[in-house]
Swiss-Prot record:
Disulfide bonds: none annotated. Belongs to the frog skin active peptide (FSAP) family. Phylloseptin subfamily. This is Phylloseptin-B1. It comes from Phyllomedusa bicolor (Two-colored leaf frog). It is found in: Secreted; Target cell membrane.
Length: 66
């Protein structure tokens, strides 16, 4: 009976350890995806902030040529 009890505890312990490792990997993956999404948004904001400068430059060039 003691052998069965020890074996059961060992199986439960190893199961909990593997579950913990899987949860940690899942959390890391979600963090990487979130960080990548934030990087994409910041790049988009930088590009959108350049549009007024580009438009004014094109307008000045058109005024100079025309």
């Amino acid at each position: 009976m003691a052998f069965l009890k020890k074996s059961l505890f060992l199986v439960l312990f190893l199961g909990l350890v593997s579950l913990s490792i899987c949860e940690e990997e899942k959390r890391e993956t979600e963090e990487k995806e979130y960080d990548q999404g934030e990087d994409d948004k910041s790049e988009e904001k930088r590009f959108l902030s350049l549009i007024p400068h580009i438009v004014s430059g094109v307008a000045a060039l058109a005024k100079h040529l025309g």
